């Protein structure tokens, strides 16, 4: 029987994961099935159990189930433990379930694709929700100095408390945003509504790279704003999406897919939709 993989979410029809993993499987000559599964909001656990019983080998998890998936794991990676959420599940040969969080790893991989060196650079991370929390440890491990700004200062300070043992991380109030950063990452959902975070424009300089975790057919509102302010480059989150999927695929199959072609194909598909 063919090994089965899936992405669980609600809603899930928008997911690009089946397309991405299909491309990865073809590229690496892996024989597998990958599907999108709409789990009832109150029935994720039973849905997952059924999947494991029917030759499920691994699963991706998206909203609103990442925290619930975390609680269903027998083992957790360091990234998952600190993120408090899981986006990748693997059924181990002993029957136990391992949880990983590859979101931040995908972000760092995409940053490395676009910048020659991350070591020592100062990054302003906007937002302190799940997307931000899943990114802090990989950013610190990459040698970045992380500064977190959130509308609610206490949330930013909570992340600092969690991640201080792992590197140089600080919370900044809006009054402390007074100079440009090397990298500005928008982990908020502001671009979904065509808005930009309420931050002073001085944080973006002529050598700043700006990164929006959102992606769309057109340039995101955050990236348009950043380029208008003179940012040297603005990148959306499509590469992060493909990057986190590549890390999941590697965990499951033991092979590392090449991401550049997949990003290009996905970009073309999104523009044609």
From Swiss-Prot:
Catalytic machinery residues: 66
Keywords: Amino-acid biosynthesis, Aromatic amino acid biosynthesis, NADP, Oxidoreductase
Residues annotated for shikimate binding in this entry: 15-17, 62, 87, 103, 215
Superkingdom assignment: Bacteria
GO cellular component: cytosol
Enzyme class: oxidoreductase
Stored NCBIfam families: aroE, PRK00258.1-2
Subunit and interaction comment: Homodimer.
Function description: Involved in the biosynthesis of the chorismate, which leads to the biosynthesis of aromatic amino acids. Catalyzes the reversible NADPH linked reduction of 3-dehydroshikimate (DHSA) to yield shikimate (SA).
UniProt-recorded name of the protein: Shikimate dehydrogenase (NADP(+))
Organism: Shewanella woodyi (strain ATCC 51908 / MS32)
Gene symbol of the encoding locus: aroE
């Amino acid at each position: 029987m063919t090994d089965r993989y899936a992405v669980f979410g609600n809603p899930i029809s928008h997911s690009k994961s089946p397309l991405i993993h299909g491309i990865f499987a073809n590229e690496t000559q892996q024989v597998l099935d990958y599907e999108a599964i709409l789990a009832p909001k109150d029935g994720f656990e039973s849905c997952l159990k059924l999947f494991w019983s029917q030759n499920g080998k691994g699963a991706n998890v998206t909203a609103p189930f990442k925290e619930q998936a975390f609680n269903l794991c027998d083992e957790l990676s360091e990234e998952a433990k600190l993120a408090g959420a899981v986006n990748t599940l693997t059924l181990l040969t002993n029957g136990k379930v391992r949880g990983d969080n590859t979101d931040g790893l995908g972000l760092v991989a995409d940053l490395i694709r676009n910048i020659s060196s991350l070591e020592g650079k100062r990054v302003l991370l906007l937002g302190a929700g799940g997307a931000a929390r899943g990114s802090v440890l990989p950013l610190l491990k990459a040698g970045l100095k992380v500064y977190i700004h959130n509308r609610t200062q206490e949330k930013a300070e909570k992340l600092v408390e969690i991640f201080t043992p792992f590197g140089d991380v600080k919370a900044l109030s809006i009054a402390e945003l007074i100079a440009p950063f090397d990298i500005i990452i928008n982990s908020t959902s502001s671009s979904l509504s065509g808005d930009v975070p309420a931050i002073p424009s001085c944080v973006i300089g002529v050598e700043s790279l700006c990164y929006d975790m959102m992606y769309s057919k057109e340039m995101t509102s955050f990236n348009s704003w950043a380029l208008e302010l003179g940012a040297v480059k603005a990148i959306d989150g499509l590469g992060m999406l493909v990057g986190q999927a590549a890390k999941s695929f590697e965990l499951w199959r033991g092979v590392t897919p090449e991401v550049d072609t997949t990003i290009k194909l996905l970009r073309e598909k999104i523009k044609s939709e």
